[in-house]
Amino acid sequence: MDYRINNEAVAACVAAQLVRNGCKSLSTVVGLTNLLMHEKERKRLLSTDNEKELSTIIGQLDGGLLTIIMNSLVLMIQGGCMTFEEGDLSLTQFGISMCEQMKDRRSKMLSNILRDMPAIMEKTVRMKENMFDQRYVIAL
């Protein structure tokens, strides 16, 4: 647990920023949030450009945070920050406002994740678009 912010709050913030930055698919948001919240794998991913290594890192992720991530997304949807329609997530005006106010640097974990997010997104976009859809089958 991080200073003043727990893992569910971090997951909610990370997922909201991913949606804000163009990730719409539920599977992709869940997969990238899971990847970003695992510090060791995030650092490994940042240090490589080998596509096979990228696939290996993603394949080795455990699902320990998936319940937390899904709970966070449900709370964000129920709280009016996000909407979920036809398998895609989108931010409401309240969610956009929340993302713009995520400047509080008291959470080192969240700061590090948000700092690494653009590079991770760029590396994973180069891979197959459906890599998380194959890894995380989410039945609704």
What are the language-model segments listed below?
Residues 85-108:
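Accessory beta->alpha helical hairpin/"wing" motif in late/C-terminal subdomains of nucleic-acid enzymes
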Residues 59, 63-67, 85, 89:
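Short, well-ordered coil↔helix boundary/capping segments
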Residues 62-78:
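Short amphipathic alpha-helical interaction segments
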Residues 74-88:
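A short, conserved structural fragment
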Residues 51-57, 72, 115-117:
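Short alpha-helical linear motifs
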